[in-house]
């Protein structure tokens, strides 16, 4: 299995003077969707208990960036004037700022079955547009001067929802409505505001080829309207695109060639295994009932087979004894610093390839978010003493990788 032991030098990679704005205008945070937060009180409690503890251990006193997750309910409660003012004062008092919001999960995200409901409402439904607008209204008032703001969202829909042509058309129009809204709000506030569709296996947008095709459909709705290039892009989740067996360099170049903005990059790792009988048995510890853990199997001839969930992959018959084994890449977010052992691997090479591309082209993306939301459902052997310990080690690993590529803390 995977060990929580650090896959880095704990001396060379210690986090003693880190702030979360890096050179070349890069911003780095961890996504607070790792903590429970179904209403604002629970969200704020997580910030007070966990985020401040992480900040105390990784920041030397410079401005500390927060990647905020807000459910629909939490966002409605936060916009109440007294509550919002109190949060602004809390940020100021703690020398913290918000530059990005995770607007993917609309409702409950911890403690009960989520699975396909994480994609609902999708972009064919008015609730998704209303929720996303509200998130941007919140973000625009939280952003420091001169800092751009991003929100990540569902990849249009989930393929198994089987949306009708009318519903597909409605999704296109609602995304354009959001572009209109962001253009007006950006003009009003002076902030560069952009929404990122987050490709994910088995969704409307699974990979960069599907992203390019979908953005062509969007542009065909309003030929010549270039505002889409500024306000709508892709939230590139390294775990998700690695599961699709994409080459980082080719995937990023494909998006760039199509004029699609990289709104944000999720720094995340997936599981990668050869499904021997022993590995299949061990994988049952990851086949839990809250989140989808899609599996994409690359067979020995290079063809890809998609499984909706890890349970489904484990239910398939194993290859005959002695037959070549396929590779399974599994949608289970693994701590960035986890060290492979016992036949388990991660897709960290994909993440490193993305950072190499950013190093070669620093203007590629400015927003980076570590996203390992699976803390509560990880097998016990993977967990460290506390979620704060995990996050601190993820910061250390990530900042070391940025430093190797010349990106240093500012402040």
Which residues make up each language-model segment?
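Charge-rich, low-complexity N-terminal segments
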Residues: 26-31, 98, 104, 113-120, ...
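Acidic/histidine-rich catalytic cores of soluble enzymes
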Residues: 182-318, 325, 334
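Active-site beta-loop-alpha junctions enriched in small/polar residues
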Residues: 31-35, 69-73, 103-106, 154-158, ...
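Acidic (Asp/Glu)-rich catalytic clusters
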Residues: 19-23, 48-65, 79-104, 139-146, ...
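Flexible, acidic glycine-rich loops studded with aromatic residues
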Residues: 305-410
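Non-catalytic accessory regions flanking glycosidase/transglycosidase catalytic cores in CAZymes
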Residues: 15-96, 233-235, 397-411
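Hydrophobic faces of well-ordered beta-strands that scaffold small-molecule active sites
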Residues: 26-32, 62-68, 98-102, 149-153, ...
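Active-site acidic/histidine proton-transfer and metal-coordination neighborhood
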Residues: 2-5, 9-13, 112-233, 243
